[in-house]
């Protein structure tokens, strides 16, 4: 890898890691992940809003990834998709490209090897609709 490309990659990683919005998204993914196992009280307002719309969000997931039933999707990937779909479909404050890029970064941080591709494919399909 050449020096310029390495520097750009380093700056991208450092920007994402130090960005307070990224940290908030990390926290929400962790809350949504734990909520999928324990029906617990959530104190984060955005996470509460997402949970209140899970029926609608999960219907969208079933539509964009029909080969993956909700109950079979990795819980980390599901939490990331739920956050991204909420931001894309209900919040609409952040540009779609930023939301997708953030979701892919979260998948790289928290998910398995196939997670970034799965998240990218599902959200790409949603954006084409």
Place the predicted regions along the sequence by residue.
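N-terminal interaction/assembly modules
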Residues: 2-112, 116, 121-129
